[in-house]
């Protein structure tokens, strides 16, 4: 019975971790042609204006100013003027293509991420019995450990996952999420989140854990404080 519970729990946990990721990637690859077609038919004009039109226009202006400045120091003959117009046109077309590709990727990521978040919710609802088995197995596994191992496990999880001892990991994660949703890299925003969110999460998690553990195993709290010092 214990072996069956362990296998069922590990299988459920693996599906919970990898299934949303796999479905998200599959849907994203399937959605990209549809989003590209929708984008190129002109039905997305308002969405485009809402997202990044101002940034795109600024970049168009920058390109034109750059080439004008470059050509001003050269001969201002008719041939050079013609070359300038052709070069600006080529660069503008390239920028429009890059702009469209970026927005198509953003829309595809948004739809795929929505599906990725919806999948675990549906899996929780449809697999309530398996969730109960997983919860029971985790509790049995945790309570079977010695108090020293329990304290070590809690210390490892809190410091590694939600603690404030790994700012570089948090920076990479926040930057990756921001890029995935189409936001530009903002060092000030990332630094603000890294300096506040992990500390708050760590405090709340430890308070919740030891409010519960103080009732069932006071010795565990003593061991934890000794190891933490």
UniProtKB/Swiss-Prot annotation:
It catalyses: K(+)(in) + H(+)(out) = K(+)(out) + H(+)(in). InterPro entries: CemA. Disulfide bonds: none annotated. GO terms for biological process: potassium ion transport. One of its GO terms (molecular function) is proton transmembrane transporter activity. The keyword DNA damage does not apply. Its main location: plastid. This is Potassium/proton antiporter CemA. It comes from Cycas taitungensis. The gene is cemA.
